[in-house]
From Swiss-Prot:
GO terms for cellular component: cytoplasm. It is found in: Cytoplasm. Mg(2+) 1 binds at residues 232, 268, 296, 339. Homotetramer. Its main location: cytoplasm. Mg(2+) 2 binds at residues 268, 271, 307, 309. This is Xylose isomerase. GO terms for molecular function: magnesium ion binding; xylose isomerase activity. It catalyses: alpha-D-xylose = alpha-D-xylulofuranose. Binds 2 magnesium ions per subunit. InterPro entries: Xyl_isomerase-like_sf, Xyl_isomerase-like_TIM-brl, Xylose_isom_bac, Xylose_isomerase. The gene is xylA. The active site is at 101, 104.
Length: 439
């Protein structure tokens, strides 16, 4: 395959001293660490929408992207050419996985029946490519936000007809995701929220959202879909206030509606910062609650208040992210999906490779640093010592449940002189830098 990216050869690992921009400097997919290859540890995935569908249009300007597969008039012809381009790209960058929305891979028709027919045609084409490609599907999902019918939401819409249409669309998306591989299925509620409470029945909307997800669970069981269900938190954009605000919010929702046994979370870095959390905070909260399923790997611009979906190149961020993944024991069905797009001014097809190379190298380097941090127990040792007071005496009584307010008051009256120790944040940040900058 050498039709759409003929100026780019297969991307290979050449090491950090290479001056070849079309090579990996830190990501060697065959390198073995702790019994697994880097490819197995990182499980990189390409986002179909940003990579092959996005055209560079923004609120202030027209499309800028030079995409040779878009030089057709019939939407189905474009969809077929995109599949060809996608698998050429996957092959050249050696991608283990890709992710898609239903409307990324096939255009909508005039009716739902026609739309489903379009999907069947493209899915059959993708299945043919999957027979000979190493690339598999990490997850699929349904686009329940772009079409004007979703102006008031999908499963949380005030219009029951929209709820029904959304259910039909997810039904089909589940079927094709199962047909293409069934690792995971993602729910992202871009329109599931509100602009003002003056016209919103929040209780009904949340109840309906839960009803919708239970229906999805039931149908997945019916068709034998064995993939992991994931919810992707995001606090806002396009909706002012979205119901899947952050990991804590999603977890509370899942537990309230008895859905926590079926769902984990897919955490996106830029969504975390939009919720005013560190990326690591969201990963840590998910990890300690056993719901960290997968990651959308990107970053945002800290000076902008919207989802910029940039390729992640900050080694500190990738290190702390992979620290949480390693502490979790690694990915099961999840992975690192590059929900990232080249900048509007990076419009040449070759830029797609350069962006992904940058992100893959950044996470590979981050993984290696994180692995050493975990192996050396740098932070674990400090944290264990910092909380040592809970290992014996009154602290042990608190943890075991033996203590109560009366016994704690008695202890406090007898030990009125409290001595705290420094948190040593600056030292720990310096140690982190030592690991980051070590050869």
């Amino acid at each position: 395959m050498n039709k759409y990216f003929e100026n780019v050869s297969k991307i290979k690992y050449e090491g950090p001293k290479s001056n070849n921009p079309y090579s990996f400097k830190f990501y060697n997919p065959e390198e073995v660490i702790d019994g697994k290859t880097m490819e197995e540890h990182l499980r990189f995935s390409i986002a179909y929408w940003h990579t092959f569908t996005a055209d560079g249009t923004d609120q202030f300007g027209k499309a800028t992207m030079q995409r040779p597969w878009n030089h057709y008039t019939d939407p189905m012809d474009i969809a077929k050419r995109r599949v060809e381009a996608a698998f050429e790209f996957f092959d050249k960058i050696n991608a283990p996985f890709f992710c898609f929305h239903d409307r990324d891979i096939a255009p909508e028709g005039d009716t739902l029946r026609e739309t489903n027919k379009n999907l069947d045609t493209i899915v059959a084409m993708i299945k043919d490519y999957l027979k000979t490609s190493k690339t598999k599907v990490l997850w699929g999902t349904a686009n329940l936000f772009s079409n004007p019918r979703f102006v008031h939401g999908a499963s949380t819409s005030c219009n029951a007809d929209v709820f029904a249409y959304s259910a039909a669309q997810v039904k089909k998306a589940l079927e094709i995701t199962k047909e293409l591989g069934r690792e995971n299925y993602v729910f992202w509620g871009g329109r599931e929220g509100y602009e003002t409470l003056l016209n919103t029945d929040m209780e009904l909307e949340l109840d309906n959202f839960a009803r919708f997800l239970h229906m999805a669970v039931d149908y997945a069981k019916e068709i034998g879909f064995e993939g992991q269900f994931l919810i992707e938190p995001k606090p806002k954009e396009p909706t002012k206030h979205q119901y899947d605000f952050d990991v804590a919010n999603v977890l509370a929702f899942l537990r309230k509606y008895d859905l926590d046994k079926y769902f984990k979370v897919n955490i996106e870095a830029n969504h975390a910062t939009l919720a005013f959390h560190d990326f690591q905070h969201e990963l840590r909260y998910a990890r300690i609650n056993g719901v960290l399923g997968s990651i959308d790997a990107n970053t945002g611009d800290m000076l902008l208040g919207w989802d910029t979906d940039q390729f992640p190149t900050d080694i500190r961020m990738t290190t702390l992210a992979m620290y949480e993944v390693i502490k979790m024991g690694g990915f099961d069905k999840g992975g690192l999906n590059f929900d990232a797009k080249v900048r509007r001014a990076s419009f040449e097809p070759e830029d797609l490779f350069l962006g992904h190379i940058a992100g893959m190298d950044a996470f590979a380097k981050g993984f290696k640093v994180a692995y050493k941090l975990v192996k050396d127990g740098v932070f674990d040792k400090f944290i264990e010592e910092r909380y040592a007071s809970y290992k014996e005496g009154i602290g042990a009584d608190i943890v075991s449940g033996k203590a109560d307010f009366k016994s704690l008051e008695k202890y406090a009256l007898e030990h009125s002189q409290i001595v705290n120790k420094s948190g040593r944040q600056e030292l720990l940040e310096s140690i982190l830098n030592q690991y980051l900058f070590a050869e």
